[in-house]
């Protein structure tokens, strides 16, 4: 039985960016705001990220890097960190999922999964109407 629990909650709010997109050229821009909350028992630092980004044609891209938006936030139990980033797809819809690699204050490494979320440029059944921002857990 572990002496403490690693637990991080990840909330995602994706948003289509019509002003930065060019659908006629196959460019669809999306922003996503992520809130990472340390719901565990121990202080932890986010070290790196790994994203798998897929479009509707099955094109998949992996993105790996240190930290998020140039930072490696240190989160005490109960603390949250929020950031906004973005990506471009060749299609009007796609998805993202991945993980964060974190290290607890005692040096113990652990991985925080990021569940799949959908990137959708247009509202279903309403072609041409940009998708409203929404929060996913």
UniProtKB/Swiss-Prot annotation:
Organism: Acidovorax sp. (strain JS42)
Cysteine disulfide links: none
Highest taxon listed in the record's lineage: Bacteria
SUPFAM superfamilies assigned to the protein according to its UniProt record, in alphabetical order: ApaG-like
NCBIfam families: PRK05461.1 (NF003967)
Domain ApaG, chain residue ranges per copy: 2-126
Organism phylogeny: Bacteria, Pseudomonadati, Pseudomonadota, Betaproteobacteria, Burkholderiales
Primary gene name: apaG
Gene Ontology BP terms: error-free translesion synthesis
Entry protein name: Protein ApaG
